[in-house]
Amino acid sequence: MVQIALHTATADSVYDMMNQGLVDIGLFMEPVNTEGLDYIRIMDSDHWVVGMKPDDPLACKEYITRDDLIDKPLILPKRRNVQSELANWFGKDFNKLHIAFISNLGTNAGVMATHGLGYPVSIEGATKYWREDLLVQRRLYPEISASTVIAWRRNIPYSLAVSKFIEEINAFKA
């Protein structure tokens, strides 16, 4: 019998744990460093959104623009690569932002937002765990999307179970 242990962390932490031999396979949201890794990209992508209380004036909008967020207290993801992606989206306005918090877990950012502490910027998939009666999300416009990769370290011996799992993953490439 094979038992799989799931561990939730930022991509940077999982990457470090893989390089220390503590984790065999990682599931990463891009952008991610894939140096020294073999991987497959999952074809579905996820959209970036901003969360707010349902009675917030921004909740009436179909989508949220850079200008909508300039004076708002934002809760951004902790990952530097993601912050860089968002800096690119905000462009010259990035330095004008009020970044109230950074968070390594979207659900924590959601809890902070329900208490009026900020507007979490997150991938849409993470917001599925927010209670819609307390927090709604709107997509960013222009849209930003992110793909997911499943990765493992290149050229190292794995257990039979991990090797078989990697074979199954690679079957998706064909």
Task: Describe each region flagged by the PLM.
Residues 15, 19, 66, 109-110:
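Short hydrophobic/charged patches on amphipathic alpha-helices used for structural packing
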Residues 67, 147, 151-174:
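Extended ligand-binding regions for polar small-molecule ligands
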Residues 10-11, 27-32, 53-54, 105, ...:
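Beta->alpha turn/N-cap motifs
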Residues 35-41, 45-47, 107-155:
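Beta-alpha-beta core module
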Residues 37-48, 52-74:
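Flexible hinge/capping segments at coil-to-helix
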Residues 1-34, 94, 102-103:
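Central regulatory/effector-binding core of bacterial HTH transcription factors
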